[in-house]
C-alpha cells in the first residue's frame, strides 16, 4: 500500500521490541503513529511515549476509532482478539511486522538481517561494533 507522509498507522502489539522500533522509524518518516498493547511497561512504553506516540492499554474495538489509514498487526494478536475483529469489520488495510519492515523501512537499502531463537541481541551487538570499526 502506498502511504503518504501524515497517514495514520496503528500498531497492534506496539510494545514488542521490534514493533516499538518500527513505530519510532515510522514516526521519523512523517507518519502519525498510534498503538495498543496488552500490558505496556518500561522500557518500551517510556521509549514510545517519549516519541509522542500514544499507547492504548489493552486491545479493544474502540482503539481503531478514529479509523487509522493502515494497521500493522504484531504476532501476539490472535484472530479472536476484539481489536482484530474490528479491524476486519472496518476493512482497514493491514500487514505484518516483517512485511511492513520490508516495504516501508528497508526497501531499496542493503540490509543485514539477524534472526533466530537465541543470540540475536549478542549477534546484533557484535555486528554493530564490527560495522562501527570500518
Language model region names:
Residues 1-40, 49-53, 67, 71, ...:
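ATP-dependent carboxylate-amine ligase
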Residues 4, 25, 49, 63-66, ...:
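Phosphate-binding loop of NTP-binding sites
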Residues 10, 59, 118-119:
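Histidine-centered active-site/metal-ligand motif
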Residues 37, 59, 75-77:
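Short glycine-rich, polar/acidic loop-and-turn segments at beta strand-coil junctions
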Residues 38-39, 60, 99-100:
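Short, ordered loop/turn segments at secondary-structure junctions
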Residues 44:
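Phosphate-/polyanion-interacting regions in eukaryotic proteins
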Residues 55-59, 95:
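Short acidic-hydrophobic, aromatic-tinged amphipathic segments that line or gate anion-handling sites
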Amino acid at each position: 500500500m502506498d502511504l503518504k507522509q501524515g497517514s495514520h498507522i496503528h500498531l497492534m502489539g506496539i510494545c514488542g521490541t521490534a514493533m516499538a522500533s518500527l513505530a519510532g522509524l515510522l514516526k521519523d518518516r512523517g507518519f502519525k503513529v498510534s498503538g495498543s498493547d496488552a500490558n505496556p511497561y518500561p522500557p518500551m512504553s517510556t521509549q514510545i511515549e517519549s516519541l509522542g506516540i500514544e499507547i492504548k492499554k489493552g486491545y479493544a474495538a474502540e482503539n481503531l476509532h478514529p479509523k487509522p489509514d493502515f494497521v500493522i498487526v504484531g504476532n501476539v494478536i490472535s484472530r479472536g482478539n476484539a481489536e482484530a475483529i474490528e479491524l476486519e469489520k472496518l476493512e482497514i488495510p493491514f500487514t505484518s511486522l516483517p512485511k511492513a519492515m520490508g516495504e516501508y523501512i528497508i526497501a531499496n537499502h542493503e540490509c543485514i538481517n539477524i534472526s533466530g531463537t537465541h543470540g540475536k541481541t549478542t549477534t546484533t551487538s557484535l555486528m554493530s561494533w564490527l560495522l562501527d570499526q570500518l
